[in-house]
Amino acid sequence: MQSYIAVNIDMASLKMLICVCVAILIPSTLSQDSHGIAGIIDPRDTASMDVGKISFSEAIGSGAPKEPQIRNRIFACSSPTGASVARLAQPRHCHRHADSTNMTEGIAVVFKQNIAPYVFNVTLYYKHITTVTTWALFSRPQITNEYVTRVPIDYHEIVRIDRSGECSSKATYHKNFMFFEAYDNDEAEKKLPLVPSLLRSTVSKAFHTTNFTKRHQTLGYRTSTSVDCVVEYLQARSVYPYDYFGMATGDTVEISPFYTKNTTGPRRHSVYRDYRFLEIANYQVRDLETGQIRPPKKRNFLTDEQFTIGWDAMEEKESVCTLSKWIEVPEAVRVSYKNSYHFSLKDMTMTFSSGKQPFNISRLHLAECVPTIASEAIDGIFARKYSSTHVRSGDIEYYLGSGGFLIAFQKLMSHGLAEMYLEEAQRQNHLPRGRERRQAAGRRTASLQSGPQGDRITTHSSATFAMLQFAYDKIQAHVNELIGNLLEAWCELQNRQLIVWHEMKKLNPNSLMTSLFGQPVSARLLGDIVAVSKCIEIPIENIRMQDSMRMPGDPTMCYTRPVLIFRYSSSPESQFSANSTENHNLDILGQLGEHNEILQGRNLIEPCMINHRRYFLLGENYLLYEDYTFVRQVNASEIEEVSIFINLNATILEDLDFVPVEVYTREELRDTGTLNYDDVVRYQNIYNKRFRDIDTVIRGDRGDAIFRAIADFFGNTLGEVGKALGTVVMTAAAAVISTVSGIASFLSNPFAALGIGIAVVVSIILGLLAFKYVMNLKSNPVQVLFPGAVPPAGTPPRPSRRYYKDEEEVEEDSDEDDRILATRVLKGLELLHKDEQKARRQKARFSAFAKNMRNLFRRKPRTKEDDYPLLEYPSWAEESEDE
């Protein structure tokens, strides 16, 4: 703080001195417009042309170049006080880099997880039963009901189908614990040929026996049955762990495609009972399309509720594999690090990391295909590319890479390295020359055998690998030593350059520290360390240059660098303005230093010389002074630049475009599921097109949800009693709904409506007849009950003989009529008595039977009177007998 105040006092004194000198001793060489002090310098307004003898302020205003190449920033640096010091580092100890990365070239095959399903062919056997009810009334028939179902075909009939290509028109099936039979067209059983169906896809082919699904008659109802025997060739899919498989029909079968009864290991998954599954050895299948019989194979048959399915028996280890080959890499490099291997695949722009211990592939389930596939791929690459230049080193090694990739790696070694190691081994063993050649030739013959797939180390594979690895290690150590020597030499060069820096700080500490710090600083030596102070950036509008470099008052002395007056910036970042808000108005005398640096004070002077010509850098351009007087401003582009840099001829990294790598293609992802959606939809569409008379059945809501909600309300509100009440409500509601549904279904039938109409007409007729009978009974009961007993009204009376007989004869005639009437009445009463007696006997028999049953349950003895009760005759019968 004290040094800073001292600087301020000196600046005020210099300001007063300059004002006095300018007023009294102004040089005559200055122009009238400048008045001894140039205006504000703005290099951006300078021009590149030579304008001759003009004032400094006019030259500054001529413009700046369009593309500056020099930094247009000016800094004012004060003398360091020692508050901030720095020291140069001491020489370092140069470490020898003896170790290097171990790399091995070879061939790699990368495996990935196999997500594709296992696809195999199956044959579906079933009979399609359609029961159709039609109604016709001298018009087009209408379908009133239709029932469709599928039933499986038994094994014995399947054998006949595969042998002769014919199927029976009879279907026997079991439903609801009962056996049923259905016949095609309701006719006797017969053999029908299986013909190809016109509707088929790429994944399914069907053969059937009939196309008819309905038959009708001209009048009335008819229920007919059609039995279509169907055989379909389909593709089935199963995914790991292969516990079930699905077909293009949309059906799934809950059994493993590799299921077998005869196995010593654990049995595969199955939810079916053993009697449903059959294994037939040496079974021959007929191709219904070509008629050819296939070679005999082991065949599996499974009977489901709706179909019978057959497929060839397969070995699981030979048919499926949990890994699949992804890519083959002819040029792979294995880089060894401390705890891992890095497999670099340059062509694929990928690197896989793995542990150093080889992976035991026998640990994987269903991965027996990997060694075979890897060996075939590596043998092919080696035969095409490396058979004449390299030999194999050891067997194929497997490593489990990051991300779930299995890497099969085959190490390679060039013939030159092998021969070089053999010669080195011969010299170390001190063998005779002739013997060396014979043994070397024998080793090469025994270790390197030529075959159709190329050279291969067989007899001494492990020893040869050890020797070749040793030779490779020797070469690798030599390369690593060379790189280590380069690094050590670079370190020593830096230590020697450090000594040069120590000497340069004694000559020009400012330039040295500015170069090291990367920004303008002021520095001076304080013994063995350097005091450093930060330079403050001065805005170019706060700088005013003088045209003359001559010292006022002494014509023989001149300034070695241009003189100027500047002011510190008033911005908050300025250290000068932070101490006093009035210091930014203070004009400070200084000189233009090197590299756009402003030196405080005017201490750089020299005796004036003749033919003086100097260029000084200010901002982006140079100021030209001749005879210590400003002439013009020169653009930096007008001065030829001499570069001190030596270009390093190094090849930069080439552009490398990273491309997306698809581990699984879209086709593979589409085939991951057990069922293929496209195939299922296509099959369902084909299936619906076979039967064009099936309409959508719409069933209305019967109100079950409302009654169920009422029952739940009772159960939640009243507890157990509510549950019981809810059960009663649901039962009653179900009964009512069933009754109403039955009545509605009955009324919706045309036959029911016709029957009801006939019944109504008959009832009306019977009612009219009954009404007439009752009215006749009320008006003339004797005539109704005893027809003929009384002559009907309007009958002429019998002619009387009283006109021609005496009175006695007339009385005899009337008595005879009464006797006849009484006889008829007695006969009617006798008939009534017989009917009544007969009814009593029937009633007595029923009463006796009921009493016997009660006595039987009560163990009460029966009596003869109870068994045969006496009949009581009416009184009028006894009187008639007495008469």
UniProtKB/Swiss-Prot annotation:
Presence of the UniProt keyword Zinc in the record:
no
Q: What is this protein called?
A: Envelope glycoprotein B
Q: Where is this site: Cleavage?
A: 438-439
Signal peptide range:
1-31
Q: What does this protein do?
A: Envelope glycoprotein that forms spikes at the surface of virion envelope. Essential for the initial attachment to heparan sulfate moieties of the host cell surface proteoglycans. Involved in fusion of viral and cellular membranes leading to virus entry into the host cell. Following initial binding to its host receptors, membrane fusion is mediated by the fusion machinery composed at least of gB and the heterodimer gH/gL. May be involved in the fusion between the virion envelope and the outer nuclear membrane during virion egress.
Q: Which residues lie within the region annotated Involved in fusion and/or binding to host membrane?
A: 134-140, 216-223
What does UniProt list as this organism's lineage?
Answer: Viruses, Duplodnaviria, Heunggongvirae, Peploviricota, Herviviricetes
Q: Which HAMAP family match?
A: HSV_GB
Please list the residues annotated as glycosylated: 102, 121, 211, 262, 360, 579, 635, 649
